[in-house]
Amino acid sequence: MAPKAEKKPAEKKPAAGEEKSAEKAPAGKKPKAEKRLPASKASSKEGGAGDKKGRKKAKKSVETYKIYIFKVLKQVHPDIGISSKAMSIMNSFINDIFEKLAQEAARLARYNKKPTITSREIQTSVRLVLPGELAKHAVSEGTKAVTKFTSN
C-alpha cells in the first residue's frame, strides 16, 4: 500500500505541473517572443531540420528513367508490366549507355580541341558507341528531337 501512496503524490505533482504550465502559459508567450529574436540560432537549427527535409527532397530528385521506361513499355506493349528489379536493371542500362556516350563525346571534343560538346559530338558518339541499325535509328530520333526543341 505504500507504493500506492507514492503514486498518488506523483499524480498530484503533474497536476501541480499542469497548473504551473497553465500559469506559465500567458507569461510563457512573452519569453517565447523574446527567445525567438536571440534564438535565431535555434531557428537555424530548426532550419537545419528543414535542410534534412530538403535532403530528403534531394534524395527524391535522384535521376531515374523509370517513368520514361514505363511510358515506352506501355507504348510498345500496353498489356505487359515490369518488375521493380527489371526496372532497376533497365535504369542502370540507360545510365551506362548515357555515360558511354558522354565519355565518347568528351573525347571527341578533346580531339578537336573544342571546349563545348555540341549535338554533332553527341551524334558522332552515338554512331561510334551503338552498333549498326540501332545507331541509325538513334541518330534519326535524336535529330528529330533536336529540330523539335529548336523550333519551339
From Swiss-Prot:
Gene3D superfamilies: Histone, subunit A. PROSITE patterns: HISTONE_H2B. One of its GO terms (molecular function) is structural constituent of chromatin. Can be acetylated to form H2BK6ac and H2BK33ac. Residues 1-23 have a biased composition (Basic and acidic residues). Core component of nucleosome. Nucleosomes wrap and compact DNA into chromatin, limiting DNA accessibility to the cellular machineries which require DNA as a template. Histones thereby play a central role in transcription regulation, DNA repair, DNA replication and chromosomal stability. DNA accessibility is regulated via a complex set of post-translational modifications of histones, also called histone code, and nucleosome remodeling. The nucleosome is a histone octamer containing two molecules each of H2A, H2B, H3 and H4 assembled in one H3-H4 heterotetramer and two H2A-H2B heterodimers. The octamer wraps approximately 147 bp of DNA. This is Histone H2B.1. It comes from Oryza sativa subsp. indica.
